[in-house]
Amino acid sequence: MKKTFFIADLHLSENRPHLTELFVQFMQTQALQAEKLYILGDLFDFWIGDDEQSALIETVQQQILQLSQKGIPCYFIHGNRDFLVGRHFANSCGMELLPTYQIVNLYGKKVLICHGDTLCTDDLAYQQYRKKVQQKWLQWLFLHLPLKVRLKIAEKIRQKSKTDKTHKSIEIMDVNKDFVEQIMQQFQVNILIHGHTHKQNIHQNPPHFTRIVLGDWGATASVLEVSANGFQFI
C-alpha cells in the first residue's frame, strides 16, 4: 500500500547525537517504505547559512540525497529554527523547498501543511520577531556576516528563546484555534497537518476539520504515516 510520511521538529544538533542516529535509522529503514517524505520544519536546531559545514550537516545531506536517488522525493517547509535553509543545500540533496503554506493531495484528500509557528498568533512577541527575521534584506545582511559571528548571534537567539518560554503560558505558545479555522477556510480544506508545538495529536472536530500535530523527536522518533486508510503515528 502506498504511504506518505511526515516528520518535523527533530532539532538536530551536534550536542544531541542520538537524534542524528535516530534520523539516520529512520531514513535507512522506514523512509524507504514511503512514496514521499515531507519535513515540516525545524529539522535542524538552528541554521546559519548553506555555507556552514559540519559532520552533522553532511550526514543529513547524504541521507536525504540517498533517499531522493531511490526515487522517493523529499519536501521541506522552513521552521522557525531553520528558516534560512536555502536552495543550495536543498539542491545538494535533491530536496524541494515549499512555501509557508502548501496544499497537497493525499490519496484523494486535500490537505494543508505548514510548520505551525504562523498559527500561534497569541504569541505576539514571537510573531513580531518572525516578521523581522523574514525580511529579505535582513537575511541577506546576516548571511554575509562571518560564520563565527553568525554562530554567536544564533546562540544568543536560542538562549533568549529558552528564557522567553519560561515567561509564556502554554496557551500563548499553542495555536489559536480561531485562526486555524480561518486559515483552513481560506485554503478551502478540512484537514491540516503541522508541527512546531511538539504536541503530537490528531484533533478531530467532524464534520468541520481534522488537525494533525506532529510530535518532536526525543527518546524516540515521531512519524506520521498517511495512506488511503487514513492517518496514524508510527
Swiss-Prot record:
GO cellular component, as recorded: cytoplasm; extrinsic component of plasma membrane
Membrane topology recorded in Swiss-Prot or TrEMBL: Peripheral membrane protein
Domain of life of the native organism: Bacteria
Cofactor note: Binds 2 Mn(2+) ions per subunit in a binuclear metal center.
Major enzyme class: hydrolase
Biological-process GO terms, alphabetical: lipid A biosynthetic process
Catalytic reactions of this protein: UDP-2-N,3-O-bis[(3R)-3-hydroxytetradecanoyl]-alpha-D-glucosamine + H2O = 2-N,3-O-bis[(3R)-3-hydroxytetradecanoyl]-alpha-D-glucosaminyl 1-phosphate + UMP + 2 H(+)
Sites where the protein binds Mn(2+) 2: D42, N80, H115, H196
Major place of residence: membrane
One Pfam family from the record: Metallophos
Pathway: Glycolipid biosynthesis; lipid IV(A) biosynthesis; lipid IV(A) from (3R)-3-hydroxytetradecanoyl-[acyl-carrier-protein] and UDP-N-acetyl-alpha-D-glucosamine: step 4/6
Cell compartment(s), UniProt: Cell inner membrane
Bilayer-crossing regions: none
Cofactor(s) essential for the protein: Mn(2+)
Positions contributing to Mn(2+) 1 binding: D9, H11, D42, H198
Binding site for substrate: N80, R81, D123, S161, K165, K168, H196
EC numbers for this chain: 3.6.1.54
GO molecular function annotations of the record: manganese ion binding; UDP-2,3-diacylglucosamine hydrolase activity
Swiss-Prot/TrEMBL keywords: Cell inner membrane, Cell membrane, Hydrolase, Lipid A biosynthesis, Lipid biosynthesis, Lipid metabolism, Manganese, Membrane, Metal-binding
Entries under PANTHER family matching the protein: UDP-2,3-DIACYLGLUCOSAMINE HYDROLASE (PTHR34990:SF1), UDP-2,3-DIACYLGLUCOSAMINE HYDROLASE-RELATED (PTHR34990)
NCBIfam families: lipid_A_lpxH, PRK05340.1
Family stated for the protein in its record: Belongs to the LpxH family.
Protein name: UDP-2,3-diacylglucosamine hydrolase
Biological classification of the source: Bacteria, Pseudomonadati, Pseudomonadota, Gammaproteobacteria, Pasteurellales
